[in-house]
Amino acid sequence: MEYISYHTSSDLETRQIGYKLAHSLPNGSVVALVGDLGAGKTTLVRGVASGLNIKEVVQSPTFNIMKIYLKGDRPLIHIDAYRLNDANTDIGLDEYIGYENGLTMIEWPMFIEKLLPKDTIYVELTNTGEEERNIKISSDNPKILEAIKNV
């Protein structure tokens, strides 16, 4: 799997990467966000929401599991799978993952891995300092990597 990597020095720079992703990814894209607690997953989603002109406050939907933002340039489906496991993944999430007219961002994707499409884009976030992060974006689809190369 090929990848592109970035280093950000602040939450603002992490949100800017998300903003640019919103403009680079085609409809139906599924983005799996991988990283420890506090790694910047939700911060990146906030940037994506900003890039889609979504004005609502974006918070991790940990207890709701999913939040759908419809008031923007295109829909954003934000899933936090942390509280899920194989026994309780059959709650209809598959209807929203890869929503054809929008973007799907999934925090803690390893808990619903069997629901992820083959062409899922993986974004791995690693803290390297207080607000510094390494961001690695990978995909098996070379067209996706080409689209986000200039992010």
What are the residue ranges of the model-derived segments?
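Conserved nucleotide-sensing/catalytic segment adjacent to the nucleotide-binding pocket
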Residues: 68-110
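Conserved lysine of the Walker
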Residues: 41
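Walker A (P-loop) phosphate-binding loop of P-loop NTPases
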Residues: 38
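N-terminal pre-Walker A segment at the start of P-loop NTPase domains
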Residues: 1-20
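Short phosphate-coordinating micro-motif centered on Lys-Gly-acidic
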Residues: 2-4, 95-151
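Hydrophobic anchor at the beta1->P-loop junction of P-loop NTPases
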Residues: 31-33
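Short beta-strand-centered segment that lines the nucleotide-binding/catalytic pocket of NTP-utilizing
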Residues: 54-69
